[in-house]
Amino acid sequence: MFNSDKVKIGICPIGWTNDDMPDLGKENTFEQAISEMALAGFKGTEIGNKYPKDVKVLKKALEMRNLQIASAWFSSFLTTKPYEETEKEFIAYRDFLHAMGSKVIVVSEQGHSIQGQMETPIFDGKYHFNEEEWNLLANGLNKLGQLAADKGMKIVYHHHMGTGVQTTEEIDKLMSVTDENLVYLLFDTGHLVYSGENPVEILKKYVHRIKHVHLKDIRPEIVSKVKNEKLSFLKGVRAGAFTVPGDGSIDFEPIFKILAENNYEGWLMIEAEQDPSIANPLEYAIKGRQYIKEKASI
């Protein structure tokens, strides 16, 4: 199905320790997390807050476990702060990831985002960009995309619950106002289904701009609870809205099929934030890896 020389399977550290809610997984160390990732059969990871900031130290720890850094999250504030502030932070981030051998940089606009607000209802409190803000976002992302290209890298935009780019319409808008040769898309199954979007249709439409994939499943009964009880994104995570592929309601087979048929190259990353005291990270990592092996033959 997939070309195993071109597609790698990784997992994000958020199942072990949650950067947005540090009490979740506070007992789990960096070394434990990456050791269990390797044990579960993964080849890569993204960067979490507990990871060493020194390139040599991080590389040594990963190389001992045959792991690579696939990417890392970068928060842009192009709609709410001067561009120069975002650019300065981005360049430092880009250079660190480049030194680690990463090819893509995950970017998500956090201007007006409610994803990190503990009390704001995720389905009712979302902000919508005006035209001026869309222009700021598009121009800024194009510039960041060029800065990434200068190092042989790509930026992949992460559509996300509670942000200005969440829905199908907003993803369409983002793709239409940005340069297709500078700004690419991160495809996240869980965030699309959570939002009520059709992931297969979005994948078909933008498969050639998708350069990074987050595989995340949802528990629909928890998402319904979040909606009915007007819970925040973070409270939804605590309640168990997300889980690993194969443990929720999303059918990943057509997604794998479309990616493979279009010769997708890059990382398939499990990213499934939940409470590690309830969902044992190693157990769920193994469960997710086995599901991918069964359904994607990789």
Curated annotation (Swiss-Prot):
Pathway: Polyol metabolism; myo-inositol degradation into acetyl-CoA; acetyl-CoA from myo-inositol: step 2/7
GO MF term list: manganese ion binding; myo-inosose-2 dehydratase activity
Pfam families for this protein: AP_endonuc_2
Group of enzyme by EC: lyase
E.C. numbers: 4.2.1.44
SUPFAM superfamilies: Xylose isomerase-like (SSF51658)
Cofactor(s) listed: glutathione; Co(2+); Mn(2+)
Gene3D superfamilies (alphabetical): Divalent-metal-dependent TIM barrel enzymes (3.20.20.150)
NCBIfam families named in the record: myo_inos_iolE
Protein name: Inosose dehydratase
Organism encoding this protein: Clostridium botulinum (strain Alaska E43 / Type E3)
